[in-house]
Amino acid sequence: MSLSTKDKDTVTAFWGKVSCKAGDIGTDALSRMLVVYPQTKTYFSHWKELGPGSPPVQKHGMTVMKGVGEAVAKIDDLTAGLLNLSELHAFTLRVDPANFKILSHNILVVFAIMFPHDFTPEVHVSMDKFLAALARALSEKYR
C-alpha cells in the first residue's frame, strides 16, 4: 500500500502538530508495548529498569520518535532514507521485524489518546499507512 500525495501531506501536517510531544509519545508507546507484549522485553534485557516511564524507556522512546521524525522528513523515499536504521536493526540489534508493527500499533493508540481532536479517521488512515511503510522500510535489510 503506497502513500498518496494526500497521505503524505496529512502525515506531514499531523507530525507538525504532535512532534513537540515526541518524547511523551515515544515513552507511552514503548511502555505500552513492553506491558501488553511482554515478549518484546527480550530486546531490552540489558536495561536495569523496564517499567512504564522508566528512564531507559523514556530515552529509547525519544530515540524511536526521532526516527519517526526522520522518516517523515524522508517520506518520499523511506527505503533509501532509512537504510542505516534498517541495517542497524537487521544486523546489529537483530530485532524481529514483526515488532515494528507492534510498536506502530502502540504509537497509533497514543496518538488517539493524546490528540483526540486532531487524530481524525482520515489522519488515522494516513498515519497507519505511513507507519506500515516505515516498518517495511526498516525490514528492507532482512530480505
From Swiss-Prot:
Annotated heme b binding sites: 60, 89
Expression sites (tissue/organ): Red blood cells.
InterPro entries linked: Globin, Globin-like_sf, Globin/Proto, Hemoglobin_a-typ, Hemoglobin_oxygen_transport
A GO cellular component annotation in the UniProt record: haptoglobin-hemoglobin complex
Record domain Globin: where: 2-143
Superkingdom of origin organism: Eukaryota
Modified residues (N-acetylserine): 2
UniProt GO molecular function: haptoglobin binding; heme binding; metal ion binding; organic acid binding; oxygen binding; oxygen carrier activity; peroxidase activity
Gene Ontology BP annotations: hydrogen peroxide catabolic process
Keywords: Acetylation, Heme, Iron, Metal-binding, Oxygen transport, Transport
Pfam annotation, one family: Globin
Function: Involved in oxygen transport from gills to the various peripheral tissues.
PANTHER family listed in its UniProt record: EMBRYONIC ALPHA GLOBIN E1-RELATED, HEMOGLOBIN FAMILY MEMBER
UniProt subunit comment: Hb 2 is a heterotetramer of two alpha-2 and two beta chains.
Additional free-text comment from the UniProt record: This fish has two hemoglobins: Hb1 and Hb2. They display the Bohr and root effects.
Family statement drawn from the similarity comment of this UniProt entry: Belongs to the globin family.
Protein known as: Hemoglobin subunit alpha-2
Organism: Cottoperca gobio
